[in-house]
């Protein structure tokens, strides 16, 4: 019985094992549950029957397998002789038993060796089972009964061993697991049984086993029960089992793998583990192939043919499947479908779902759907008692909270308002709201919200949400309509089915009619079904296509006036009239299509044709995009009346019937025919097909026309074509082309459209132009129509025509007039244009004798003017401050008179000036008499006048700008003053810069004065060039910028084109300008001024005026001191100026100053150029220059001076300019006086025209033109004036300047000392020392000339005539002009050009400057960025124009070009800078200008503008006092000397003309990026992490170098195009870029060395580069400029903080290429400077240093490219050792300082490493004792 007990124990144990393994929920490998399982098995071992059953089932299975798979070799052998098998197995078993015994030791008490062997085998079997995923598919957990035959067991063990051998790793792991967890549920013993394939025993036993197997085949093994068969089983077992004790022991051990019953479960487990270990050890000898067949215990599949791995996989799959089928769903309770939270009880889940649905706003229906989807499958499979029980218990726990929550929800449900309450609420809402639909929507939403809680409650879940009552949803009208629709459906159901689906009627029409008081909607017509119409069954009138339901008819407002209005009622019935009125402009083109009521039904073919035509017309309507009828004129009158006018301003939609106004008498067919005719002819408008004539407008657009139409419709036009036409080849076809000037393309197109179609629908905005065209070509009907065009109002209710007068007329017409004048000059005086070019050059090349005379006269006159203005400045200033137009006019008149007198005085000097003076006087009269409005009108008129005499225009424009500048300066001192604003406006309009200031005011103080000028010019020329964002007109009209009041005052104050530089020029310059057109244009200008007066504009204007005043000096002062103040302030500025050109410049005092500077520079620079070919031309050039000079110098003076100081400067400038001729006028019209002087000079129309024309051509608007061309002259003059003023301020500079400059400087110094105190503090011009005054003056001139090209203000600031002093003044002016970037630009350019002290030096500098324009072109590029359109506008291809591009006014001469390029470039850079710096102090801009001028000479290419160096220079300028001028000088020296070789002025100019440089790829927003992102971005370029701010700057810098704008990198460009200048430019820029000392040093070097003499101060390089670099952020003004003029710079420095702050802001905050480049340029420049310092460059002149830097860069570039390996590393951003590169460079003879090399590498984004150097340093530090380190550090 012991054996049976053991067997039973083993069987139950195995059965429990199998059972547990069948339970997937229990981990079969967990050893913790083993003891309990064993105990349970032992408890169930009480019955022997159970054990017998196990054995029987085991044997049955064994026999079954044996019988089935006897084919195996081993099986065959076993079957052959059981005895042999048994014996052999016994032997093996004995051996194994012995081993087992040895292993077991004392632990196994009972089992003899024989029984241990079977145990071992069984263990092996179990082990194999463990290794195999054991599943008992049959549920025979206890199948593991001991086999009666030990051999069989042994065999099984062997098989198991073989399996273990084959798969030792997995089996061992599983064996271990199962040894540790013998009862592991997951390991079904049946697999072991299957593994064991014992030889068949007795037949009786086999049968019994088979029977037992049938009983125990269950999916889930049940607990074994004691049965009566126990004895029989026992007997059978005894019979089957050999009597041999060993065998018995074997069988017992095999089946009772555990120790005897008494033994504990732990002992059994231990024994099993040991046995399994033995089996594993012995299993290596056997293989399944040798042992026999192998069957899957789960699916009974024969796996004998499989290797161990495949068998394991198969069994694992079977086990997995069995587990899936047997395992209860683990998530008994589904998780929350909303948040995924698991639950233990259903109630907890239910309560959570409710709460979660409320929190997550999930609707009940959606929640139910989710729950159903989620629980559909899991619930079906999950029903475990354990979980249900746990859920139950836990659910009970949660019942309390759940039940508590339910009542809460019930409360909520109770709280839900009743339906009555909801209805009441809805009703109240509906009463409060006008529309019923909206309340309905809100009601529904409210209702749904109320219903939601109900849906959440169980009680209400079943109830569908209740929709709000219809009573609440719809009003009575809607209900009535619905009822009517239902009835209609009942009555006409068939018809409705065939009709277009009804659309809800729109209430827009009804409301629109009510609001507009239009005729009621047309009466209901018979239903028109689109299906019928589209079927083309017959001709349909247009209104028939209009379905009320599709879109109710929209009737435009009835024309308040016009013929159209009258015919409308009679023409068509109400419906038709409304429909016709409703017609969109496009439909107007096809009005004939069935306008009248449908006539008798035509034939089918006719109907089809008509319907098709209607559809075609409708399609045309869709295609027509023009505001006026695109295809026909039938709807002309009606279209005109109702054009673009719809009730509520809503666009016409749907099928809008054409107007039937034209042919009320005719039937639909007649209208249709006419409509077809009109449509067909309308299609030919501007149609190139068969076109035999072309009309080219001022904008360059070409319109195609057909002569036969013109011949039939407009004989005068065809006559004009025949007379004026010329042949043009386009696309290889020779066609006749006619220039149609003074009219916009739109107007010309509309005119042609009328001729082709007789369409009366004329756009209100074009009525004036159309009227002019109609008058011009004798189309009386069109004239009448234009008169009848109703005054349409814009969205603001402002009359369209009024707005057009302000915007389009002032902008487009005035601009077109300028273009016209330019074209007229071009056509009428081709030679004059050529002469103008020559004259410009000649003007630049003014005779030295004349210049000297001018300087002398200016000095004397300025002294006189200073005295006079000092006396009258207060009165004039008060007048101007009064802001009354009368006072402004009076001042203007006084100034005009003074200027006229001065002009007369100067007449002996220049005969041309007499005319100019006369013109000025006339213009003064014209301008003075009209009030502000008249002045603005005058501006408008001036533009047309300019057309007539470009020369006079240019002169008057120039002169006018001068006055404007003075006025603006005065105004600048009193930015609040209206007069100041007007003056500023006038100045801007006159010079274009002021007009641009208007835009600057409104949008862009940032835009430099040059930009303003150019913008004005462009705006004058092109309506599109409405540079001023606030108002294109305003932009065109200088006055709007400053401020409407100022503009008007200035206009009144000065007859010069106050409204516009062009207008001013026309008025002042030529008698024709004084023609009645002037008043009209003045009015327009005035309207523009009013626009500029708009709050935003006014503020901008005031700001700009202040800034401009700083730039222009005088302009700001007009507010402080009227014309007198201006005059007085000019005495300060002008005193020097007047000293130079006191007598000559009286009238064109400013002009003369401008001329002096320009001409001096031109004479000095462009002596190479022929002296002005004609005295008149010279005078014209002088006049023009004086104009610019006056404007700029005045502005500069004011800018330099504080607001209070500016007026005196302005007066000084006026004195300087007007002393000779306009000492008195200077006071009031000093600014204008200079322009008048220009007019006098320009009085000779041909020459002056030529000069101005050349200028105007580049930028048609005189403002723009004056900024470009006349700006060149003007700018040069202004520069001269400014320079003179600067010289006056800084007598030493003046003395160092040209001999004239010295004289002027002395004179000015006499005067300047007065102005300088104010100017010096505020202006950087003063920074230049006396020695550098000339150089600076040259620098100013050179840059200022380029700038003059770009900006009259800026270029005049650095006028050559002013020489050193003027250069200083211009610098100061530029510095003051931070608001007016043009001034800044001018000064730098001027400085660059004026570097040379002597005239020769100046000439050299000017030549260099001319060559430096490429360098200077950079700043001009910014100007062009703002005003680049001007260039394309100029019809005349002029070098000056190109130069203007580079330096807006480079038309004058190479030197002027240089100055202009530099100035324009400086101006542009300031223009860009102005965005930021304009807010800054004027000194900042001046410094910037000086710096940029220096930069310009070095590299005044666009790169410099983009370079942060330029911006930094601007800031540095503010920081740096006189140093700033030296940088300009340095560039002039470098630029003047090298520029010749580097001269690419035209290219640079072209660049300037290009649109603003904008990166093709927008710069990422580095400023707002997170630090990790910035680090990653830097890592891409191999840059180590830096502080966030530095990373931002560095990334921006990298972006600038890696993402090119239209041009290559600014520095690269400047370096490549201007190798010599680039390095200096970079340095200058670097110094400019918050490197005051560096920039100052360069400027000083250039100023000191000039071309040669001004360099002495070059060595005075201060540590500024680094210092400024550090101060790039702080913008501390380093006042270490070697020049002694630094004190004035200091004053500027005081102002610097604001502009610098703005610059810093732009650098920090803006992702613009400018700021990033500025930082990079700054660093680059600093590196160069430091390198230069290291190399002892301090002793080298600025120009030499620039040349060296450029050469060094080029050498480095060439060297890197010559080394393929190094170049590849550079291209791939692979770092290379810096020290190695330095060593290689030294070996190759390239000596480059470390700092310069670093700067070069950083500038070009070349990745390098200094790891070796750092390691060495670290090692050295480690070696050094700490004390030494400290000492070294100290």
UniProtKB/Swiss-Prot annotation:
GO MF, any single term: zinc ion binding
Residue numbers carrying Phosphoserine: 169, 287, 1028, 1044, 1070, 1121, 1135, 1185, 1464, 1469, 1610
Compositionally biased spans, kind Basic and acidic residues: 575-584, 902-916, 965-979, 1011-1020, 1094-1111, 1457-1468
Annotated ranges, domain BTB: 691-764
Keywords, comma-separated and alphabetical: Coiled coil, DNA damage, DNA recombination, DNA repair, Fanconi anemia, Isopeptide bond, Metal-binding, Nucleus, Phosphoprotein, Repeat, Ubl conjugation, Zinc, Zinc-finger
Keyword Transmembrane helix attributed: no
Residue span of region Disordered: 24-49, 69-206, 376-417, 452-471, 561-610, 826-846, 902-1151, 1195-1504, 1516-1564, 1605-1746
Compartments it resides in: Nucleus
Span of zinc fingers (UBZ4-type): 293-323, 333-361
Chief subcellular location: nucleus
Bias type Low complexity, positions: 95-104, 1351-1362, 1706-1730
Compositionally biased tracts (Basic residues): 395-411, 1338-1350, 1654-1672
Region (Interaction with SLX4IP, ERCC4/XPF and MSH2): 1-669
The protein's assembly and partners: Forms a heterodimer with SLX1A/GIYD1. Interacts with ERCC4/XPF; catalytic subunit of the ERCC4-ERCC1 endonuclease. Interacts with MUS81; catalytic subunit of the MUS81-EME1 endonuclease. Interacts with MSH2; component of the MSH2-MSH3 mismatch repair complex. Interacts with TERF2-TERF2IP. Interacts with PLK1 and SLX4IP.
Role according to the record: Regulatory subunit that interacts with and increases the activity of different structure-specific endonucleases. Has several distinct roles in protecting genome stability by resolving diverse forms of deleterious DNA structures originating from replication and recombination intermediates and from DNA damage. Component of the SLX1-SLX4 structure-specific endonuclease that resolves DNA secondary structures generated during DNA repair and recombination. Has endonuclease activity towards branched DNA substrates, introducing single-strand cuts in duplex DNA close to junctions with ss-DNA.
Protein name in UniProt: Structure-specific endonuclease subunit SLX4
Gene name as annotated: SLX4
